[in-house]
UniProtKB/Swiss-Prot annotation:
Residues 59-252 form the HD domain. GO terms for molecular function: dGTPase activity. Residues 7-28 have a biased composition (Basic and acidic residues). Keywords: Hydrolase. This is Deoxyguanosinetriphosphate triphosphohydrolase-like protein. Gene3D superfamilies: Hypothetical protein af1432 (1.10.3210.10). One of its GO terms (biological process) is dGTP catabolic process. NCBIfam families: antiphage_dGTPase (NF041026), dGTP_triPase (TIGR01353), PRK05318.1 (NF003701). Residues 1-28 are annotated as: Disordered. PANTHER family: DEOXYGUANOSINETRIPHOSPHATE TRIPHOSPHOHYDROLASE-LIKE PROTEIN 2, DEOXYNUCLEOSIDE TRIPHOSPHATE TRIPHOSPHOHYDROLASE. It holds the Pfam family HD_assoc. It comes from the Bacteria.
Length: 446
């Protein structure tokens, strides 16, 4: 497939700016970097709640680190596989994907995502990656109705789960609850796919693919995870596979660093949960470096800990390979990046360590639960009387959606998911707390 078709934008542009010689993907990167949706990541939860400590990462700093790791992966693959240099393409493309990958995630992390998914259960559901696709293609006001109007290849790369939610949803898999406070995230996992409301854009992105490629790329299968009852997609594009690896490495390594600095993960937990598994690794580098990395990670010397973090990131980045799936015709689908098996296992061990001692920590879960309640309370209030409570511009979007017979509840999810943690908490107080006073915050549209 010609590269030009992947550089096309959904809405043609005739902007001719003086002496502007940027590539299409450099323009995409600039649009993402300068967007309000990207700026709001500075006040959205990554793992540890915003306001707990000045050191830890927010979704903004996480996204910047994912971008750096993503371009590092591309540089390594370019040297390791020179024959794939044309496929790797622009560093600006990978930066765009990595910077944008979390833009759709709502306030309060997973708690906010589960809450919105529950409130949208009869209206197409909610999932952060699907919302990212929606923001980039429809909501961010770079254009009147086409969002950031990014290149087709950029939109293909952001598609982590290339299938509509209606194809993935398994009915009857969620227990109904009688009170919002009874909502358990494990019982309401979001369906990982594109919202059916955005199927027109999804179709446009996949337009260049052959019938066979599209059918295979969007195929689904039962999930192997016991707590995920819905069907799952099986494939992603080459660019997306690099972005996802960068995200996983940043999550496992950098979020672990935050937890170590704050004393949430200890050296004894490392020795108990990580060392016994990795010392038997089939890769000699992992076996040889393990003890030294463990010592430095928990050192009181800041530079030693940073050296260990750098060693871990470098170890994972240099262990990435390119796989070939000849069943696909399109090179962007035929080739995918992945970790060598021993390093994939090591990364999973680190991710499980973060999940066990950080994500599942009661104090973190209390913050997540609180966020759930805030998001559900806001949604319920706005849904009860949209033309009374929504900001004027959002009211107009809601009315337009109603008049056109579209999913007006999606407008409510768009508004709430765009909020920062602090803004959502403040708005909740103004709506429901008698002590909040009568000075309701008047702010510009989210």
């Amino acid at each position: 497939m010609s590269s030009s078709v992947w550089q096309e934008r959904r809405h043609g542009e005739d902007k001719q700016r003086r002496n502007d010689h940027r590539s299409p993907f450099q323009r995409d990167r600039a649009r993402i970097l300068h967007s309000a949706a990207f700026r709001r990541l500075q006040a959205k939860t990554q793992v540890l709640g915003v306001g707990m400590n000045d050191f830890y990462r927010t979704r903004l700093t996480h996204s910047l680190e994912v971008s750096q790791i993503g371009t590092g992966i591309a540089a390594q693959l370019s040297r390791k596989y020179p024959e794939h240099k044309p496929l790797l393409g622009s560093m600006s493309l990978l930066e765009s994907l990595c910077l944008a990958h979390d833009i759709g995630h709502p306030p309060f992390g997973h708690g906010g995502e589960v809450a919105l998914n529950y409130m949208m259960r009869h209206h197409g559901g909610f999932e952060g990656n699907g919302q990212t696709f929606r923001i980039l293609s429809k909501l961010e006001p770079y254009t009147e109705a086409f969002g950031m109007n990014l290149c087709r290849r950029t939109m293909l790369g952001i598609l982590k789960y290339p299938a509509p939610q209606s194809l993935l949803f398994v009915p009857g898999s969620h227990p109904e609850i009688t009170n919002h406070r009874q909502l358990k995230p494990s019982q309401w996992p979001p369906v990982k796919g594109i919202f059916d409301d955005d199927s027109d854009i999804f179709d446009w992105v996949l337009e260049p693919l052959s019938v066979a490629d599209r059918a295979r790329f969007t195929s689904v299968q039962p999930s192997l995870q016991p707590n995920y009852p819905h069907l799952r997609t099986q494939f992603k594009s080459f660019d997306c596979s690099i972005m996802e690896l960068a995200d996983d490495i940043a999550y496992a390594v950098h979020d672990l660093e935050d937890a170590i600095v704050m004393g949430i993960v200890t050296a004894s937990q490392w020795q108990q949960d990580v060392a016994p598994t990795l010392k038997h690794s089939g890769d000699p580098w992992i076996r040889q470096e393990l003890a030294d990395i463990g010592t430095k990670l928990f050192s009181h010397e800041h530079h030693l800990r940073k050296d260990a973090i750098g060693t871990l990131v470098n170890g994972f980045v240099t262990a990435i390979i390119i796989n070939d799936d000849p069943a696909f015709e399109e090179p962007l689908l035929r080739f995918n990046a992945s970790l060598e098996p021993e390093f994939a296992n090591a990364l999973n061990v680190l991710k499980q360590l973060v999940f066990k001692y950080v994500i599942r920590k009661p104090e973190i879960q209390m913050l997540e639960y609180k966020g759930q309640q805030i998001v559900m309370g806001l949604f319920e209030a706005f849904a009860s009387d949209p033309e009374r409570l929504l900001p004027l511009n959002t009211q107009e979007r809601w009315r337009t959606s109603e008049l056109q017979g579209q999913n007006s509840h999606r407008v409510l999810a768009d508004y709430i998911s765009g909020m920062t943690d602090e803004f959502a908490g403040r708005l909740y107080q103004q709506l429901f707390s008698p002590k909040a006073g009568s000075n309701v915050e008047l702010s510009k549209e989210m």
